[in-house]
Amino acid sequence: MGLPPLEFSDCYLDSPQFRERLKSHETELDKTNKFIKELIKDGKSLVAAHKSLSFAKRKFAGSLNEFKFRCIGDAETDDEICIARSLQEFAAVLGNLEDERIRMIDNAGEVLITPLEKFRKEQISAAKEVKKKYDKETEKYCGMLEKHMNLSSKKKEVLLHEADVQLDQMRQHFYEVSLEYVLKVHEVQERKMFEFVEPLLAFLQGLFTFYHHGYELAKDFSDFKTQLSISIQNTRDRFEGTRSEVESLMKKMKENPHEHLALSPFTMEGYLYVQEKRHFGTSWVKHYCTYQRETKQMTMVPFDQKSGGKVGEEELVQLKSCIRRKTESIEKRFCFDVEGVDRPTVLTMQALSEEDRKLWMEAMDGREPVYNSNKDSQSEGTAQLDNIGFSIIRKCIQAIETRGINEQGLYRIVGVNSRVQKLLNILMDPKISPETETEIPSEWEIKTITSSLKTYLRMLPGPLMTYQFQRSFIKAAKQESQESRIKEIHCLIHRLPEKNRQMLHLLMTHLANVAAHHKQNLMTVANLGVVFGPTLLRPQEETVAAIMDIKFQNIVVEIIIENYEEMFSTVPEMPQTNSQLHLSRKRSTDSKPPSCSERPLTLFHTSHSSEKEEKRNSVNSSAESVSSSNANSSVNSTCTQRSNMNNLNASDPDLDVAKVSRPNSLLNPKNISGLLPSSLNPSPTSPPTCPMVSAPSSPMPTSSTSSDSSPVSVPRKAKALYACKAEHDSELSFSAGTVFENVCPSQEPGWLEGTLNGKTGLIPENYVEFL
């Protein structure tokens, strides 16, 4: 198991788990430092003691063989595996030469000792200095915080305000030092992958120069040496890119820390001071607390961030009520009382600030709720996978393949931003019919067209390969064998929504054509993976862990380009049955409430007129809406999509919680005809390949009419599983346990329509269950 990533957002929480993860990194650095010292010592002995050369080589080889690399993340790339295995390979080479006596290597000190000393002094020692600064700032901040918490509320407001300002300044400084320390630790851990191994490789190369006896051994070693050199260079290149991304994320975190906090399973978490009664008075003990609104469970762990602080035993409280503590009833500020179900006494807690207290009371449904004003950070792009979107991509591809397929640095060279935006505005103009096959004029440069294509893909509401399957694609790229990777990615591609898969097919066919001309344009499959990986598989939140997975995103794109014909022309075997999938989804959906990001976006404004209700047709919530203008085509395409959905792997972690993102444009076979080869277009004459079925989460009886072949839903009752506050006039606000009348699908995917207290409105589908 590798080292856990250190998230910048954890610096602001400063939780016990964060300190433990940080300690594991520090321990690893100490081990590395100690090992480098031993390695240098052994190297000097090797140079100085010609008579004891055999013994020194055995010891040196033994040291190399015992050390194991630990990389950040839960999986390693082929390059990292190669680098991690390199020490064992070096030890094997030295073991074969241990009986041979040779002359001392004159340049061993320059190629081996000096770089390792430089790395240890400049990198590991620098990390230790930053650690000292971090520990010192922790002491200062915690001390000042304790002093601040002991201020009496009876003091003058001016003094209290001044103390608050000083504490805020100290807190910000502490956060900055913490962020810098985390960045430095990450940098040293990454640097050791190449600055540590590269001197060893150079040392061995020097040995081969002087080893006439080891000529054959050196020839056998040359293949691995080449592979390792490439892996080191690839790792170095990735480090440069990763470092800039991490530094950029750190800057964003400094500017707006609250907007980049990591998603948490807890409703609220942070530090609270808990009043504990003693024989002689009371004391306030610092605890790290977490609270889950659904289970009303609060955990408290005594912990102090000061150096040497130990994590206490976890205590669980089943919440009964939360009441704000009156200011005049206690000397401390920011206090509130928590009453537990199984506790005879009331817990008095002190928050770190007034705002913090309001957040805790809101989370625990106290008497002073503060509605969360945080907005969904996911920006909504104007690009869609509709007729216009397919037309734009096809026109760009046609222009590129016609005029610029052999241009060097294709897709690498970026166009002028203003020109790119201008071209996109022209192509996305709704006044221009998407069916018009007008070519992009030759006045537009190829780099502008390629940048426009990439920009349009980035403007989509979600990545082309979807947030839902993003982790699954990354997991597939981490498979050990290439065959397993191809098979898993093949299955995932056929689980994508229909339009996403069609657009991906169109794009990958083009990229394969670009790669076929790599001798002229220098864009190999690997280069194209670097360009399109972060775009097609961009993560839902920007974290250090996501940045570390960029290398696997590139691998996914490389595999699809190299095997695009097999990926899209054949259907993988998926033996999962419908009933298994239904049970798996129901269990996973019932396990926890949907998060904010899982709540569907409102597209239509609901009209409550009886005329519209009579005309409304049911829309299956597990598939895209299909136009009924062409009955055979719509049934065929819907059945194909549902057949793929029914064969999903129920064990996939991405399906544990049904996530409803912004819906794609309505799927109309007439709109997408001509976008792709005829093999991808649904046949208007072929009969349906599967029966019409209801969504697993909301099975409803259907009946057919003479005017429409789509099923008509019968209104039913439904019960709310979780509370929800309306964000639009067309939505309903409700609490857990509320029963709705006349519930049926709405025109918006992911939403139901129901009646509560005489008012009809929209209800998130994954918030309710049918009775």
Swiss-Prot record:
Compositional bias ranges of the Basic and acidic residues kind: 608-617
Limits of the Rho-GAP domain: 383-568
InterPro entries cross-referenced by the UniProt entry: AH/BAR_dom_sf, BAR_dom, GRAF_BAR, GRAF_fam, GRAF_SH3, PH-like_dom_sf, PH_domain, PH_GRAF
Region Disordered, residue ranges: 575-712
Subcellular location: Cell junction, Focal adhesion; Cytoplasm, Cytoskeleton; Endosome membrane
Location of the BAR domain: 7-262
Superkingdom, taxonomy of origin: Eukaryota
Main localization, broad class: other
GO biological process: signal transduction
Residue intervals of the SH3 domain: 713-771
Biased composition (Low complexity): 618-637, 673-683, 691-712
Single Gene Ontology MF annotation: GTPase activator activity
Keyword Cytoplasm included in the entry's annotation: yes
GO cellular component, one term: endosome membrane
Marked site: Arginine finger: 412
Keywords attached to this entry: Cell junction, Cytoplasm, Cytoskeleton, Endosome, GTPase activation, Membrane, SH3 domain
Start and end residues of each PH domain: 265-369
Gene3D superfamilies: Arfaptin homology (AH) domain/BAR domain (1.20.1270.60), Pleckstrin-homology domain (PH domain)/Phosphotyrosine-binding domain (PTB) (2.30.29.30), Rho GTPase activation protein (1.10.555.10), SH3 Domains (2.30.30.40)
Annotated Polar residues bias: 638-650, 662-671
CDD domains, A to Z: BAR-PH_GRAF_family, BAR_GRAF, RhoGAP_Graf, SH3_GRAF
Function, in words: GTPase-activating protein for rhoa and cdc42. May be involved in the regulation of neosynthesized protein export through a Rab-endososomal dependent export route.
Protein name per Swiss-Prot or TrEMBL: Rho GTPase-activating protein 26
Species this protein is from: Xenopus laevis (African clawed frog)
Organism lineage: Eukaryota, Metazoa, Chordata, Craniata, Vertebrata
Name of encoding gene: arhgap26
